[in-house]
A protein has these predicted regions:
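Active-site-adjacent betaalpha module
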Residues: 1-12, 40-48, 72-199
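A short alpha/beta connector and helix-capping loop motif
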Residues: 9, 27-58
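Acidic-leg catalytic submotif of subtilisin-like serine proteases
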Residues: 12-18
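Active-site loop/turn elements of alpha/beta-hydrolase fold enzymes
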Residues: 18, 57-59, 155
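Short acidic, Gly/Ser-rich segments with clustered Asp/Glu that frequently serve as metal-coordination loops
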Residues: 19-24
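Short glycine-enriched, charge-decorated loop/helix-capping segments at active-site entrances
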Residues: 26-32, 71-77
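Early exported N-terminus immediately downstream of N-terminal targeting peptides
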Residues: 51-52, 56-75
C-alpha cells in the first residue's frame, strides 16, 4: 500500500450495506477474503485522503418504510435494532465519515447522497459493498446517470458468484471495474478522464 498521498479531491468511496443480513452462507463461502479486502480498501482511502461515505439499509419495525414487495411478504432485511442490521466491525465508519441511512436499492434516491457529493465537489465515485447485483449496481448506475465517473471495486463487492460475475461484466457502459491494489496506480488515468470532460 502506498504511503504517498495523491490528488484525490474529486474522488469519494461509497461503501454500501456491509451488514449482517446481506452476508449469506453462499456469499461467505465464495468470498472468504472479503472482510480483509474491505478493511484494506478503507485503510487505503483513509491513508490517501479519499473521502468515504457509508450507505446503510435500515427499516422501521412497523413496516411504514418497507418497500411494497417486502410488506406483502412480511419480511425485511436490516430492520432497526436487529442483529441483521448491524455493520461488520471491519466496515465501521471512522473520524467523522458520513453515514447515510437508506430505504431503497439506489443510494441516490433520497437526494442526501448527491447533495453531499455536490457540496464536496466529487466527480469520480468508487463503489463497493453488498450486494453486487442489487444495491451496488443500482447505486453505481444512479451515479453514472447523474454525471459522475464510476469504478466498482470488484474485490470489495460480493454476491452469489454467478450474479457477481455477470454484473461486473455486463455494464461496461455504466462503470469501470477496479481492485484495491489498482486504485493508486489508476489515479492518473482517472484524472485524465476528468480533465477530458472539462474540455
Amino acid at each position: 500500500m502506498s504511503d504517498v498521498v495523491g490528488d484525490w479531491d474529486s474522488f469519494a468511496l461509497l461503501l454500501i450495506d456491509v451488514q449482517k443480513d446481506f452476508w449469506t452462507e453462499v456469499i461467505s463461502i465464495a468470498f472468504p477474503d472479503y472482510g480483509q479486502n474491505v478493511a484494506s480498501l478503507l485503510a487505503l482511502c483513509r491513508n490517501q485522503g479519499i473521502d468515504v461515505v457509508h450507505l446503510r439499509a435500515q427499516f422501521r419495525k412497523d413496516q411504514s418504510d418497507w418497500l411494497a414487495h417486502y410488506r406483502l411478504g412480511g419480511d425485511m432485511p436490516c430492520v432497526e435494532e436487529t442483529a441483521g442490521a448491524e455493520v461488520f466491525e471491519y466496515a465501521t465508519e471512522s473520524g467523522g465519515e458520513p453515514v447515510i441511512v437508506k430505504q431503497t436499492f439506489d443510494g441516490f434516491l433520497s437526494g442526501e447522497l448527491n447533495e453531499w457529493l455536490q457540496a464536496n465537489r466529487k466527480r469520480y465515485i468508487l463503489v463497493a459493498g453488498l450486494v453486487t447485483s442489487v444495491c451496488v449496481l443500482l447505486t453505481a448506475a444512479a451515479a453514472a446517470q447523474r454525471g459522475y465517473l464510476v469504478s466498482v471495486v470488484e474485490d470489495c463487492c460480493a454476491d452469489k458468484p454467478e450474479a457477481h460475475v455477470h454484473t461486473l461484466e455486463r455494464y461496461p457502459f455504466v462503470f469501470d471495474v477496479t481492485a484495491v491494489d489498482d486504485i493508486v496506480t489508476s489515479r492518473d488515468d482517472w484524472l485524465k478522464k476528468l480533465a477530458a470532460l472539462e474540455t
